[in-house]
């Protein structure tokens, strides 16, 4: 699908910025990106204590994002470099095995994960095949799988089921389907972790590595697509419904401060999961045609995704949180590796997976905007783009003009030689939808299905959505959304750049440069739209909400000199840390809050534009404040 979609508007500008940032200059992130590449004949030995496949997993993340970004931009220079990387592997098998020779044999203790890096790299091969239609790519991949002796019935090797089923869809080779089914079924028969069908279909709250959970939970839907067996699909649907219900955070992604923990606002999103969750949900959206998955994808990309990277795409966070008003080399307030720099904006802020995986989330989003099945064209999620396809051998072009989700209107300019049906979502977070064809109003659709418009000839279709500001309250907490966007009290902050030797992309120490210690006194909010949206950047025009708040004098940065840090999230093994650290504090309860000054009007901007931000606030009682002042 990549070749048929051209990014435009804000999405194109973002991809251009991405390529000018880390995606096109990945060596700035350091090891392993500065010395290891798939298809490279000579690489340094692995770092002592590190699994052999680990560095190839990270560089494969980058490769996939890089390939897709280059193709979507039509950047010939980078497309040629992407081809070089892919064909260095495809054209140089070891027998039939594809990939680095050093990970051909599974090292002791890694028999269940030694082929995980291949899943990541083969996604880049999938993108290149979709662009070139070169049959040499799937042919080499099929030979690799059907002659490999690795055990695909173990975690994370079982994730190769995704690639096996993609190959089956192209070749219809029954051996691939059999390998996918037997591997998946054998894994579930012996699974000892919470990423499995038994837990997905049970009431149990899963405690699982979030990346593993997001990657695994799509496989059932893919097997359903290949086999028609409903039991496979039920597991995937249940797994993601459970994650949405138990772990969803204000930034639109599940809690993933390494493991799934809860939906408490103080938990963070690991940036890898912005990519992995939305990649998996795109499969479910396409297979089930349930629009809710599109809603979830948009919330995640335009809040959590935008909020985890700097405006120039030269730095990212490993952990990103709804509330973060300090970001430096010691500010990670999550229990896991607490006091580390994993919440700092840097080219490589923690371990190397996120610097690679961050390159994938927007290219994946754009490449999954559109789909076509027979004479049905689906706009799965919204974004400025041009989609081209053929129906019955005749050309169809749909140009989507929009600044969605900042501006809630989408126009499709359609040029077609063939009749078809255009299907669109009516997002659940919209309160109204006005649909016109060539200016003539037609009935709006439903939120629970994809809605079809019969297109007989070239025309112009406009979707004009309306959304309401929603105040989300939980106990004594409150935050605000409108449409797909979450809103935050955001600030650029004082940014102090720091450069590592030989690098030109800095990491930042960021500190609040304006008051942030407010409680909210009313659930009412006024919306001000934007004219001339340019991007998620506080220095540029943005929509905002105006809310009423008051300062809380005893709500301050948290300074600790001794605390517990989790060093193993599965068992929650802890150790002591000694030394001064400053953290974003938890909210003060209304009973403990000491207010000062007068009630103020506060502007909340899109979460994704705010790198330092307060999103979730203490909810105060305005009448109680007035009563207290009367007593004074």
Short names for language-model regions:
Residues 88-91, 121, 127, 186, ...:
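Glycine-rich, acidic and aromatic/proline-enriched surface loops and short helix-turn segments
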């Amino acid at each position: 699908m990549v070749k048929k979609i051209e990014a435009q508007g804000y999405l194109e500008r973002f991809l251009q910025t991405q390529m000018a940032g880390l995606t096109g200059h990945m060596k700035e992130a350091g090891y392993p990106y500065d010395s290891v590449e798939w298809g490279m004949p000579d690489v340094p030995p692995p770092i002592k204590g590190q699994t052999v496949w680990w560095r190839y997993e990270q560089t494969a993340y980058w490769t996939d994002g890089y390939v897709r970004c280059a193709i979507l931009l039509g950047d010939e220079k980078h497309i040629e470099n992407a081809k070089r990387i892919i064909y260095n592997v495809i054209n140089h098998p070891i027998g039939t095995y594809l990939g680095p020779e050093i990970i051909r044999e599974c090292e002791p203790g890694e028999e269940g994960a030694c082929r995980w890096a291949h899943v990541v790299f083969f996604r880049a091969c999938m993108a290149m095949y979709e662009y070139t239609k070169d049959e040499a790519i799937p042919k080499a991949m099929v030979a690799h799988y059907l002659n490999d002796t690795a055990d695909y019935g173990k975690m994370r090797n079982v994730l190769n089921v995704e690639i096996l089923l993609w190959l089956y869809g192209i070749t219809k080779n029954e051996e691939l389907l059999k390998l996918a089914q037997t591997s998946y079924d054998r894994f579930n028969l012996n699974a000892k972790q919470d990423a499995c069908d038994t837990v997905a279909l049970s009431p149990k709250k899963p405690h699982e590595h979030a990346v593993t959970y997001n990657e695994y939970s799509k496989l059932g839907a893919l097997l359903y697509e290949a086999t028609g067996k409903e039991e496979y699909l039920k597991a995937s649907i249940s797994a993601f419904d459970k994650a949405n219900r138990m772990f969803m955070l204000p930034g639109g992604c599940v809690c993933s401060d390494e493991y799934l923990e809860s939906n408490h606002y103080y938990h963070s999103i690991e940036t890898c999961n912005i990519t992995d969750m939305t990649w998996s949900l795109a499969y479910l959206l396409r297979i089930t045609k349930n629009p809710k998955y599109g809603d979830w994808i948009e919330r995640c990309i335009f809040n959590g995704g935008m909020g985890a990277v700097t405006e120039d795409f030269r730095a990212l966070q490993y952990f990103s949180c709804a509330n973060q008003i300090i970001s430096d080399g010691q500010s990670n307030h999550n229990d896991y590796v607490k006091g580390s720099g994993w919440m700092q904006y840097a080219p490589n802020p923690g371990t190397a997976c996120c610097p690679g995986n961050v390159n994938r989330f927007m290219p994946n989003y754009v490449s999954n905007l559109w789909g076509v099945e027979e004479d049905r064209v689906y706009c799965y999620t919204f974004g400025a783009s041009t989609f081209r396809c053929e129906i019955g051998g005749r050309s169809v072009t749909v140009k989507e003009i929009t600044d969605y989700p900042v501006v809630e209107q989408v126009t499709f300019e359609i040029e077609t030689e063939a009749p078809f049906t255009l299907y669109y979502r009516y997002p659940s977070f919209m309160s109204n939808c006005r649909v016109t064809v060539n200016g003539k109003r037609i009935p709006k659709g439903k939120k629970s299905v994809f809605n079809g418009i019969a297109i007989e000839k070239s025309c112009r279709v406009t979707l004009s959505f309306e959304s309401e500001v929603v105040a989300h309250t939980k106990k004594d907490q409150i935050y605000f959304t409108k449409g797909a966007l979450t809103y935050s009290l955001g600030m650029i902050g004082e940014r102090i750049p720091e450069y590592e030797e030989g690098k030109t992309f800095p990491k930042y120490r960021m500190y609040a440069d304006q008051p942030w210690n407010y409680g909210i006194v009313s659930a009412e909010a006024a919306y001000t739209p934007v004219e001339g949206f340019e991007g998620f950047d506080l220095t540029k025009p943005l929509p905002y909400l105006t809310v009423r708040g008051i300062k809380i004098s005893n709500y301050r940065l948290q300074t600790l000199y001794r605390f517990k840090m989790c060093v193993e999230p599965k068992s929650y093994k802890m150790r002591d840390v000694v030394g001064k650290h400053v953290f974003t504090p938890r909210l003060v309860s209304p009973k403990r809050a000491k207010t000062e000054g007068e009630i103020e009007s506060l502007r909340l901007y899109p979460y994704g534009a705010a790198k330092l931000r307060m999103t979730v606030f203490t909810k105060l009682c305005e009448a109680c404040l007035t009563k207290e002042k009367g007593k004074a």
